[in-house]
């Protein structure tokens, strides 16, 4: 199969005014697990270019809020969202929450963070795992009881360890590769449902 950057999902995202095709991965995950509800407060890690935040914003509605964090700027404008351009590892999240009027815990913590790839599979997988572990740590600290967590990672031999680690925190853990994920992609999504 030939790689086509402007595939069906790319065109659909443009038609529906989403910042990126990745929105459909989150939408598929939500359709399967019914995580999003009106009025929720959502923390989006790795928010750029903004499509996951757009989806969360739409689902949370006027009474919900979204806080997005990314190294890269997020240019989408959403009435119920705030975006911080920074390295998550350098932030004092409590200060950021207070500064922007967010009071944890969050209903959903989601991470579409990805490392800058090197082309060296093991290096890229290890960096992806580190980012997912960072996101899991944030979820453990700031996600409410019965809240949900979604994290993208590049599949590797350490995948099972991370899934087992998540099982300590969540009532149910599922691995998902949405149909909208490119066939050649090694990314997979771990979903933690109902934080203990």
From Swiss-Prot:
SUPFAM superfamilies: S-adenosyl-L-methionine-dependent methyltransferases. Keywords: Cytoplasm, Methyltransferase, rRNA processing, S-adenosyl-L-methionine, Transferase. It catalyses: uridine(2552) in 23S rRNA + S-adenosyl-L-methionine = 2'-O-methyluridine(2552) in 23S rRNA + S-adenosyl-L-homocysteine + H(+). The keyword S-adenosyl-L-methionine applies. The keyword Transferase applies. Specifically methylates the uridine in position 2552 of 23S rRNA at the 2'-O position of the ribose in the fully assembled 50S ribosomal subunit. The gene is rlmE. One of its GO terms (cellular component) is cytoplasm. CDD domains: AdoMet_MTases. It is found in: Cytoplasm. Its EC number is 2.1.1.166. It holds the Pfam family FtsJ. This is Ribosomal RNA large subunit methyltransferase E. The active site is at 152 (proton acceptor). HAMAP family: RNA_methyltr_E. GO terms for molecular function: rRNA (uridine-2'-O-)-methyltransferase activity. It comes from Bdellovibrio bacteriovorus (strain ATCC 15356 / DSM 50701 / NCIMB 9529 / HD100). It comes from the Bacteria. Belongs to the class I-like SAM-binding methyltransferase superfamily. RNA methyltransferase RlmE family. S-adenosyl-L-methionine binds at residues 50, 52, 70, 87, 112. Its main location: cytoplasm. Coiled coil: none annotated.
């Amino acid at each position: 199969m030939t790689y086509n950057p402007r595939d069906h999902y790319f065109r659909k995202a443009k038609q529906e005014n989403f910042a990126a095709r990745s929105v459909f991965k989150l939408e598929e995950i939500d359709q399967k697990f019914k995580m999003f509800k009106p009025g929720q407060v959502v923390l989006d890690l790795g928010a750029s270019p903004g499509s996951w935040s757009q989806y969360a914003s739409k689902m949370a509605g006027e009474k919900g809020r979204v806080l997005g964090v990314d190294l890269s700027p997020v240019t989408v404008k959403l009435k119920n969202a705030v975006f911080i351009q920074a390295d998550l590892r350098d932030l004092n999240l409590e200060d950021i929450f207070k500064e922007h009027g967010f009071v944890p815990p969050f209903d959903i913590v989601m991470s579409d963070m990805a490392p800058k790839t090197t082309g060296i599979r093991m290096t890229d997988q290890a960096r992806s795992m580190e980012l997912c572990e960072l996101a899991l740590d944030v979820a453990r600290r700031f996600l409410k009881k019965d809240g949900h967590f979604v994290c993208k990672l590049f599949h590797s031999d350490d995948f099972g360890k991370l899934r087992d680690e998540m099982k300590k925190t969540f009532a149910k853990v599922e691995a998902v590769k949405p149909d909208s994920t490119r066939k050649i992609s090694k990314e997979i999504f771990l979903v933690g449902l109902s934080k203990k």
